[in-house]
From Swiss-Prot:
Glycosylation sites: 50, 106, 140, 147, 152
Biological source species: Danio rerio (Zebrafish)
Keyword list, A-Z: Glycoprotein, Protease inhibitor, Secreted, Serine protease inhibitor, Signal
Gene it is expressed from: serpine3
UniProt-listed PROSITE patterns: SERPIN
Major localization class: secreted
Pfam families in UniProt: Serpin
Signal sequence, renumbered to the chain: 1-24
CDD domains on file: serpinE3
Protein's UniProt name: Probable serpin E3
Amino acid sequence: MPQLSASSLFICLWLVDLCHVANSVLSSSFSDLHTQFGISLYQTLTETENKSNLIVSPASVSLCLGLLQLGARGNTLVQLEGTLGYDVNDVRVQNILSRPQGDLANSSEGLRLQLANALFIQTGVKLLPEFTQHALGWGNTSLLSVNFSNPNHTHSRLQQWAHYQSKADDHLQTREELHHSSGEEEEATRQDHLLYMALVSTLVFHGAWQKQFLFTETQNLPFTFSDGSTVKVPMMYQSSEVNIGHFRLPSEQEYTVLELPYLDHSLRLLVALPSDRKTPLSQLEKQITARAVGLWDTGLRRTKMDIFLPRFKMQSKINLKPVLQSLGVSDIFSPSAADFRGISDTDGIFVSEAFHEARIEVTEAGTKAASATAMVLLKRSRSAVFKADRPFLFILRQISTGSLLFIGRVVNPADMP
């Protein structure tokens, strides 16, 4: 059965030598806030990333920033709240943020969604009990001890944990494994006060379409790049009734949005494509807003369509430090400004690096394609056609929360990792 598989990995390295809560009022539209953060994150990335395929998980990044927010104080907390748009200490926010895991983790209809965090703490660093309690209840968080003086061992542990989370089908690792010995604590304090912590967040998703793309219908068709050149790529096909809508950008250019639902209807993949082949995808990327995405909910209409969607697989590795700084989160990276007194009594904790890795694959199930299908595809019914044969934007969105699990662009489906 056709399915979409995705996973993301977010890593923060903290350099230790270690913000009062300004009570924020929860917005009446948490969905809009979540969407706004995701769009802002993506648009900031498009300003710095090259014109290649791109994918990011706003849900995963916001989960990590939320964990930081639990231990932030002063202006550090203000910046995190301002960027996310909400206060994770609000129980209503916590209930909403826990929905993705609760809604889908136990689905029996071809869906699997797993969210997990791990906070790797330098041996010898003592966490505050209150933070430990809150962290272990936040997004399936594990607290794990590691000696950062051995980089190879540390990297191996981070990768092993992330690999375990991406492969575990039935459960998530949520536990506390803090083991300190006096010798390890001594060693930790001898590192010129340079203690480390690492935060790893994973989001894994596998989903089956409500209506499958038959592997035997896939054929090689041209995909046109932004410069006008073409390449032949495996193009999936199906004819069915789907939700589709036509919208207009502030610059008056039109674009089309197609919705592909999953079996239990909790998630949907939205594909946005400029209607005019001469309109570059960058125009859509620059002008899309959270409000526009919200209007898609009411602007889509059920229509019989012939759908052509390229099979694609991509991976992005992103340095989030400049991106978050552009979004207004700067104190966490400053040794003098970062205020994480809610995490530990140890002075001088700040974030030195922040990386994000995301992967996605859209394909049909099956092991080999059939040939001689071009004539069949070219003689379909007279239904309207949606053909993603040029660069397009995609969003994997959860309906109940508005959370953008993934947002990205396909500019070259033939460029696969």
